[in-house]
Amino acid sequence: MNDRDPEFATKAVAVIELLLSPPTDGPLFCVDEKPGIGVRQPTAPDQPPVPRGPPARGRPARREFEYTRNGTVDLLAGFRVNDGRVCGMVRLKHRSREFCELLALLDEQTPVGQPIHLILDPVSSHWSAEGVTWLDAHPQRTFVFHFLPVHASWLSFIEVWFSILSRKCLRRADFADASIATQQIEAFMSTYNTHMAHPFEWKKGVRFYKRLKDKIAARSELQLAA
């Protein structure tokens, strides 16, 4: 539990309860960025494994450890808690401007008239003047921001999905340039939504949730006693 945010328990409980029981009036997205995805390519191709047996002694696959680095890309994405589908985009940066692009993408994929609920970090790009201006220019859509406590990204389901992306797409991937990295990440998101998407379950533990609730109750009692 991280107490750097004095309202950690209250904010965390609010987020957990949203994840346990998503709003019924519109979709709930866990939103975040995965920055610094390496665009790199090994200087030599992989060598396949050699089967063991006469006359060969066999050996495992070999992978070149030297790479040519060609920068990085950033993924901005939202995990829809209601059904487990992912909506995202790959960019070279993840500023307020790109965050507004993500909001526009979520807007496009949500039926008219439904509010869009977002669970997200309280970082500057998520509540900047540029973002406020964008929201004011799109009054036809209501966005409801539910901010995580400080340093509590791990509460969000999008972090779980980012780990899936890393294991299944990025771990051994080679990208010659940013466009190829973008294509492969977008292809994985499409494949995931078609064949693997499912709602996640809260697995941090009932005891953890109860501990937070007890902390809030104890604080309330102290305030009443004062």
Regions found by a protein language model. Give the residues of each.
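C-terminal domain-tail junction helix/linker
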Residues: I180-A226
